[in-house]
């Protein structure tokens, strides 16, 4: 565990939560016997895959309590907003959606409204909700998700808003029930928190310091998933390259990949996110020797200017990043690189931005998550001078998007007439008559096929490359 002071979570605490789950289940079962109706919950998730997986845990707890899911807020007895605070836009959406529930709350006296996640770790947000959104029933954060049964029970018995936000991370809690959003694919937390303190980022304040799960706990979870038909796992961490540093047993992320690669039933292993300063030879080696580890590396570079990188506290240079790209490509020739890029960080000049474009041209990413810099309270960047005007940020952003999309389209054109292996995930979102799946490089492929192929790895010949996806024909 981290040397930082933490909240200890005892087995007694966890047993208490299990008892409350059983008690609530009995109450809900009795109500179902009386009315023939199950209570329903709607969970809306904002942000990253870590938040998505947290919502899967909340859904697992609620399923054990006797709730079923709904997508209709008018049907729901419980509405949860699992929030993100990485960018202001996500926060504004949350406030808007919470506000829109005020009239529904007046109409449905049995409706419970809960907000949780990263936004709630910020004191000014909790203060805002207390003063302006008094129809909210329950507020909790990222560190005490295991207490959700108790908090829900207390909230349902109280006329007051229940607020329980821990300002320190606790022990990692294993064994929480999970209702997976996807059958074939599964998210798996291998660690929590971040120690990097990039000057623009709020995550270390909302997710706490780095803590790694024990290797055996991860193995047990993956083996159980494999038994239940999961074919692809995605290992999650704010910085997976730091995995193992807080464990007593000496290990690292590369070794973990090699262990998981041996588990029967799992066909593909993905992971995110990797910090460039911590990308090790051990990880690169694992990508070359582990047959199940996908040839896809998400490696955020954020900015191309060394001055901006220093101001961001990224702890690498443009030159070092490009050398790393070449190193990875030399060892894993078919690797697909994706990245994150921020436009308009405080002090960014036109020359700085051109350095970012230069990295995009040299690294030739398969795709990129591109963002306008968003000021976050409690971060050093918020106090910096020379904030870039919005019109300049948007103009640069559009130029960046053009470059990223052009290169992505060029890379995809090279797939014409190639045969690729696709894990079939389901029907296409754009055409119900077609199937869709992904290559090891995470390329989205649409093709005609039989639904019996869902869950299988099939060979597809690419007949029509597009900028963001590939069309093909199934080979028998």
Curated annotation (Swiss-Prot):
Binding site for [4Fe-4S] cluster 1: 48, 84, 118
Cofactor binding comment, as recorded: Binds 2 [4Fe-4S] clusters. One cluster is coordinated with 3 cysteines and an exchangeable S-adenosyl-L-methionine.
Pfam families in alphabetical order: Radical_SAM, TRAM, UPF0004
Localization, UniProt: Cytoplasm
Needed cofactors: [4Fe-4S] cluster
TM region(s), chain numbering: none
Domain Radical SAM core: 180-410
Segments forming domain MTTase N-terminal: 39-157
Keyword Metal-binding included in the entry's annotation: yes
Name of the protein: tRNA-2-methylthio-N(6)-dimethylallyladenosine synthase
């Amino acid at each position: 565990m981290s040397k930082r002071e933490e909240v200890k979570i005892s087995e007694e605490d966890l047993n208490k939560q299990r008892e409350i789950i059983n008690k609530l289940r009995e109450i809900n079962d009795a109500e179902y016997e009386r009315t023939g109706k199950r209570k329903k919950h709607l969970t809306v998730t904002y942000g990253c895959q870590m938040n998505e997986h947290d919502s899967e845990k909340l859904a697992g707890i609620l399923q054990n309590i006797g709730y079923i899911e709904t997508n209709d807020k008018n049907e729901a007895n419980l509405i949860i907003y699992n929030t993100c605070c990485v960018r202001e836009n996500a926060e504004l959406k949350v406030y808007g959606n919470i506000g829109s529930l005020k009239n529904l709350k007046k109409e449905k006296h049995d409706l419970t409204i809960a907000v949780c996640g990263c936004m709630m770790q910020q004191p000014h947000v909790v203060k805002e909700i207390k003063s302006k959104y008094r129809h909210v029933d329950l507020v909790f954060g990222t560190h005490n998700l295991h207490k959700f049964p108790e908090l829900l029970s207390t909230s349902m018995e109280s006329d007051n808003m229940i607020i329980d936000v821990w300002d320190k991370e606790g022990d990692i809690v294993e064994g929480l029930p999970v209702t997976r959003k996807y059958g074939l694919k599964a998210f798996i937390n291998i660690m929590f928190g971040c120690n990097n303190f990039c000057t623009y980022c709020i995550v270390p304040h909302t997710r706490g310091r780095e803590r790694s799960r024990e290797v055996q706990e991860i193995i047990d979870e993956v083996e159980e998933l494999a038994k239940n038909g999961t074919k692809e796992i995605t290992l999650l961490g704010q910085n997976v390259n730091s995995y193992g540093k807080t464990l007593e047993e000496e290990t690292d992320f590369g070794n973990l990949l090699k262990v998981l690669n041996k588990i029967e039933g799992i066909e593909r292993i993905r992971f995110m996110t990797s910090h460039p300063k911590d990308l090790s030879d051990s990880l690169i080696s694992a990508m070359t020797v582990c047959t199940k580890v996908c040839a896809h590396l998400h490696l955020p570079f954020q900015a191309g200017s060394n001055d901006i990188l220093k101001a961001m506290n990224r702890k690498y240079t443009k030159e070092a990043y490009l050398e790393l790209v070449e190193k990875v490509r030399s060892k894993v020739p078919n690797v697909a690189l994706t990245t994150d890029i921020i436009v308009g960080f405080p002090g960014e000049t036109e020359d700085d931005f051109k350095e970012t474009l230069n990295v995009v041209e040299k690294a030739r990413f398969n795709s990129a998550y591109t963002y306008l810099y968003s000021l976050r309270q409690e971060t050093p960047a918020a106090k910096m001078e020379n904030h870039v005007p919005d019109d300049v940020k948007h103009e640069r952003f559009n130029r960046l998007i053009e470059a990223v999309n052009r290169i992505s389209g060029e890379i995809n054109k090279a797939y014409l007439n190639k045969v690729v292996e696709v894990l079939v995930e389901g029907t296409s979102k754009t055409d119900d008559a077609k199937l869709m799946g992904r290559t090891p490089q995470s390329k989205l492929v649409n093709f005609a096929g039989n639904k019996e192929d869902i869950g299988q790895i099939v060979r597809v010949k690419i007949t029509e490359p597009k900028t963001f996806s590939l069309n093909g024909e199934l080979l028998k």
